[in-house]
Every structure is written in C-alpha cells, then in structure tokens.
Amino acid sequence: MSMVYINIFLAFTLSFMGLLIYRSHLMSSLLCLEGMMLSLFVMMTVTILTNHLTLASMTPIILLVFAACEAALGLSLLVMISNTYGTDYVQNLNLLQC
C-alpha cells in the first residue's frame, strides 16, 4: 500500500473520528461528513487513474455531485434549525416533534 493511500485512509479515519467526537454542533458534524466525502472522492479518483479503469471514470464525478447535494441540504437544515431554535446544538433537537 503506497503512502498516498495511507494518507487518504488516515484523512477518512480522522474525519470519522471527528464525527464521533464533535457531534454536539451540527456544523462540525457537517464539516466532518464533508471531509469523509472528500477523502472518498480522492481515493476513488486515485484508484481509477492508477488501475486505468475507463468504465468507472464517471463514478467520482457522481460521488462529487451527491456530496454537493448533501452539503446543500445540510446547510439549509442548519439555517432552518438555527433560525427556529437559535442554536445549532444537536442534543437540543427532538426529532419526534412536528
């Protein structure tokens, strides 16, 4: 395993650990999710380029589109929650209320 793969896997692991540790604020959770998606994008791109997989060359672009949609939805939820409740604490949100 080359150093590039180790660094990308380490970035994914650190983002996942950040998601587990800093889950009190919604903004920090969204940033950790974006870090995970970015490391997955780079890992897929490097793997496809080094193995010359021409049929899977569109897969990283599709992943990037889904990551952009996830970021837009997450930020819109963050704005809605901060306008409604005044904070972005995750523990203050009760998802069973309508």
UniProtKB/Swiss-Prot annotation:
Transmembrane regions: 1-21, 30-50, 61-81
Localisation per UniProt entry: Mitochondrion inner membrane
A GO term, aspect molecular function: NADH dehydrogenase (ubiquinone) activity
Entry GO terms, CC: mitochondrial inner membrane; respiratory chain complex I
Topology in membrane: Multi-pass membrane protein
EC number: 7.1.1.2
Catalytic activity of the protein: a ubiquinone + NADH + 5 H(+)(in) = a ubiquinol + NAD(+) + 4 H(+)(out)
InterPro entries: NADH_UbQ_OxRdtase_chain4L/K, NUOK/Mnh_C1-like
GO BP annotation list: ATP synthesis coupled electron transport
Keywords on record: Electron transport, Membrane, Mitochondrion, Mitochondrion inner membrane, NAD, Respiratory chain, Translocase, Transmembrane, Transmembrane helix, Transport, Ubiquinone
Presence of the UniProt keyword Ubl conjugation in the record: no
Domain of life: Eukaryota
Top-rank EC class of the record's enzyme: translocase
UniProt function note: Core subunit of the mitochondrial membrane respiratory chain NADH dehydrogenase (Complex I) which catalyzes electron transfer from NADH through the respiratory chain, using ubiquinone as an electron acceptor. Part of the enzyme membrane arm which is embedded in the lipid bilayer and involved in proton translocation.
Family indicated by similarity: Belongs to the complex I subunit 4L family.
Subunit structure: Core subunit of respiratory chain NADH dehydrogenase (Complex I) which is composed of 45 different subunits.
Name this protein carries in UniProt: NADH-ubiquinone oxidoreductase chain 4L
Species name: Gulo gulo (Wolverine)
